[in-house]
UniProtKB/Swiss-Prot annotation:
Keywords: Cytoplasm, Hydrolase, Nuclease, Ribosome biogenesis. It is an enzyme of class 3 (hydrolase). It comes from Natranaerobius thermophilus (strain ATCC BAA-1301 / DSM 18059 / JW/NM-WN-LF). Its EC number is 3.1.-.-. It holds the Pfam family RuvX. This is Putative pre-16S rRNA nuclease. GO terms for cellular component: cytosol. One of its GO terms (molecular function) is nuclease activity. HAMAP family: Nuclease_YqgF (MF_00651). InterPro entries: RNaseH-like_sf, YqgF, YqgF/RNaseH-like_dom, YqgF/RNaseH-like_dom_sf. The keyword Transcription regulation does not apply. GO terms for biological process: rRNA 5'-end processing. It is found in: Cytoplasm.
Amino acid sequence: MRIMGFDLGEATIGVAVSDALQLTAQGKTVIKRQSLEKDIEQVTKLIEDYQVSKLIVGLPKNMNGSLGQMADQIMDFIKSLEQEVDIPIETVDERLTSRMAEQTLLEADVSRKKRKQVIDKLAAVNILQTYLDRQVNKNNN
């Protein structure tokens, strides 16, 4: 089974999915946010399409570790999603994942227009890959 990772923003949701061995994350799509109901509907369809067994959602924390306003919105989204799907949903600290994604794209000399199109997807990859790497490290210790 696969694991799906999300980078939830105010305007978009970046989506990444693991390989079947749950070792690597691949960016899949960016959902343009419409309404909570439609967003949940699109996410649910992706979960079914990719036969996902677990969801990982990036939770933005402030640099001091506290949760900010966007984190509250994400927790509300997770609560709504839990009503629709019967798989575990975990959060991971997503501090700086969007900045890491932007830096990666800048180093690759990707144009500003293209960066804007893929940054949320790449942030979702970073979120999911962080989770997958932790699982590998946990199993090796």
